[in-house]
Amino acid sequence: MNSESSKQKQAFALISLAGIFLALFACLTALLLNYDLGAVGPENSVVGFSTVNKFIFDKLGQSDFWYKLTELIGYFAIAVALGFVVYTAIELFRQKSIKKLDIDLSVLIIFYIIVALVYLVFEKALINYRPILVDGKLEASYPSSHTLLTVFIMVTTIVQLLNRVHNRPLKTALTAIAVVIAVIVPVGRLLAGVHWFTDVLGGVFLGLALSLCYAAFCKCIPDCE
């Protein structure tokens, strides 16, 4: 009973944190459409928080090294997600029934779909453009998709590692790698100069909101330790 009560408290704390990050994302998005709008982007494209964004972009500049590194890490994160999709498909085939499939795996796939849909929505619902031209054209920039996807995938991967890997040294090592990746991509995208500061911040907020929702759900599953 004490263990179950503890898990419920942890789930409540996680969903509360998720709500905070989602609220921060919503506030940031609304402010980007209204606060300190300035034509500081390429081809005089307008950006919210223009003073802060331009200051940080001018100070950090651009880095081809960080761009290539974060691109590679982004592909690795997607490969990790695909690995979970394949593992879930194998388990589904082995169990021969979706009802016998571990709930945390089923819900993880649902969350992957949600994140993919969110990505597509923001590709169409333009908030602002990148601080650079891509192939000579303006491109949607908010939130940073690399940041959103990597933060979400790595945090949910940590949840899976904690639940499924029983070798403590291996679990610790893999979790540490996931944390490093989740941190280095947002920082790297900013240093690469391919996103405004608020793009990266929005990606972090939304990635954490969605991944913490998933973590909270897992805490509510009786057999998910």
Where do the language-model regions lie?
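Central hydrophobic cores of alpha-helical transmembrane segments in multi-pass inner-membrane proteins
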Residues: 80-88
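Alpha-helical transmembrane spans of integral membrane proteins, capturing the lipid-embedded, hydrophobic core
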Residues: 23, 76-80, 108-120, 204, ...
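Alpha-helical transmembrane segments of integral membrane proteins
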Residues: 70-77, 106, 110, 145, ...
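N-terminal transmembrane-helix/juxtamembrane module of multi-pass inner/ER membrane proteins
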Residues: 2-80, 123-134
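Membrane-embedded catalytic cores of phosphoryl/pyrophosphoryl-handling enzymes
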Residues: 7-16, 30-33, 134-225
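Membrane-interfacial, low-structure loops and terminal tails that flank and connect transmembrane helices
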Residues: 1-11, 91-103, 225
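Membrane-interface loops
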Residues: 40-42, 88-173
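Membrane-helix interfacial "entry" motifs
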Residues: 6, 60-71, 96, 100, ...
